[in-house]
């Protein structure tokens, strides 16, 4: 029995960011595609309409930038690993090389949750 689009979306809503990240990687490998290729293309219409559409689209995607690890570097590395699918070395390199993006092009809710988790671990974070 095939799942409907609504059923798939309901399943995705119940997944964590890490699970979704792992799913995307598996999907990319299985079908030999990249998530970047699926990004919507903005077609320039009228000057006012195109500018309004771009401004609205920018509000939907946010980047979580780690600007500093603070005193609790190990805790920050643990949170980075929870938010991403990075290994220990990669997460440590990301934390050591601040400022670096932890999450890119995520919705407002996910960006706020990630920023709050990182701040709770003692990191300094920007959401752009």
From Swiss-Prot:
Coiled coil: none annotated. The keyword Ribonucleoprotein applies. One of its GO terms (molecular function) is structural constituent of ribosome. Transmembrane segments: none annotated. The keyword Ribosomal protein applies. Keywords: Ribonucleoprotein, Ribosomal protein. Pfam families: Ribosomal_L12, Ribosomal_L12_N. GO terms for biological process: translation. InterPro entries: Ribosomal_bL12 (IPR000206), Ribosomal_bL12_C (IPR013823), Ribosomal_bL12_C/ClpS-like (IPR014719), Ribosomal_bL12_oligo (IPR008932), Ribosomal_bL12_oligo_N_sf (IPR036235). GO terms for cellular component: cytosolic large ribosomal subunit. NCBIfam families: L12. Forms part of the ribosomal stalk which helps the ribosome interact with GTP-bound translation factors. Is thus essential for accurate translation. Homodimer. Part of the ribosomal stalk of the 50S ribosomal subunit. Forms a multimeric L10(L12)X complex, where L10 forms an elongated spine to which 2 to 4 L12 dimers bind in a sequential fashion. Binds GTP-bound translation factors. Belongs to the bacterial ribosomal protein bL12 family. PANTHER family: 39S RIBOSOMAL PROTEIN L12, LARGE RIBOSOMAL SUBUNIT PROTEIN BL12M. This is Large ribosomal subunit protein bL12. It comes from Streptomyces antibioticus. The gene is rplL.
């Amino acid at each position: 029995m095939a799942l409907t689009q609504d059923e798939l979306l309901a399943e995705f809503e119940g997944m964590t960011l890490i699970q979704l990240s792992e799913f995307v990687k598996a999907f990319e490998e299985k079908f030999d595609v990249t998530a970047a290729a699926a990004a919507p293309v903005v077609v320039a219409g009228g000057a006012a309409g195109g500018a309004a559409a771009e401004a609205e689209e920018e509000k939907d995607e946010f980047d979580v930038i780690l600007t500093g690890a603070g005193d609790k570097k190990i805790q920050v590395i643990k949170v980075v690993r929870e938010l991403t699918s990075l290994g220990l070395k990669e997460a440590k390199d990301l934390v050591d090389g601040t400022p670096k993006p932890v999450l890119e092009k995520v919705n407002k809710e996910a960006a706020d949750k990630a920023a709050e988790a990182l701040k709770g671990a003692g990191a300094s974070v920007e959401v752009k």
